[in-house]
Amino acid sequence: KCKYQKVIVDTYWNPGSDNGRPELFTPAFRLDLFFLGYKKGLRNHDGVSLEENFGELPDNLQDYVEWVRKWIIQKKSEGCVALKIAMAYERSLHFEKVTREQAERVFRLKESDITQEDIRCFQDYLFWKICEIAAEVSLPLQCHTGMGQVIDTNILQLNNVIKNNPETKFVLLHCGFPWVDDLFSIVDGYPNLYPDLTWLPILSYTASKRVMHQLIEMSQIDKICWGCDTWTVEESYGSLLAFRFSLCSVLREKIEDGYLSVNNAKDIIDKILFDNAGKIYV
């Protein structure tokens, strides 16, 4: 019923896996675990270990960054079509441009001496490096925005990173909900920014309609994508129905107002539900 040709899957417990179904799933390579690489033995909030998935950790910053680069290149060769970062569940999305010296300090300290500032500097540095690597290997970078630990997880926290990495494609998942106005403030200024309506119609029908209305009026149709962001087949179909209802409601209103023709609306449906994703994830 969903009529999907391919599904981009995020197997966060086994990053970069196609879940054993390559005919259906194309992986995004989730990189959150690598933000724990400043010390051995750490696990994320889901109990997943970086070392158990990717082996022994390098013990210095330069080798660590190259190690991350190696894994990204390998996962791309295995079929990954995107990188993904969902660190908004763990921390702020305000990633500062820190120096190498600031970032590598954490490798020289005993675990008992490591501060939150040391961890932040390491993670900030790594995020900027990942943005550079994403451009080098031509993989879009999906960023979970909005919901999570909700302190500084709005889209504007990423403004400086997006501005200074013009060759990196930033796919902003969930459009920063509930702070969707942040998206409107910068989407027109960055050709490398792609709004993604994933999850949004389930979170808020009203917000999803508002976002689509405004993005259509801002001529962003060629950049919008949608995804279900669900676990099961039943949930995925329900998510698709919710999005169809929201999108059709928006297009009907735009046609009734004389803003769009029926052919314009059909073109928008094709782009959001198929064409745009095909151009981004190539």
Question: Where is each model-derived feature located?
Answer:
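Active-site beta-loop-alpha junctions enriched in small/polar residues
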Residues: 12, 30-36, 86-90, 146-148, ...
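Short hydrophobic/aromatic-enriched beta-strand-loop microsegments
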Residues: 27, 193-198
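A gly/proline- and charged-residue-enriched helix-loop-helix capping module
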Residues: 35-64
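Histidine/acidic residue-rich metal-binding segments in metalloenzymes
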Residues: 60-85, 92-193, 207-225, 242-246, ...
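Mid-to-C-terminal alpha-helical segments outside catalytic/metal-binding sites
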Residues: 221-222, 237-282
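Family-specific functional microsites
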Residues: 234
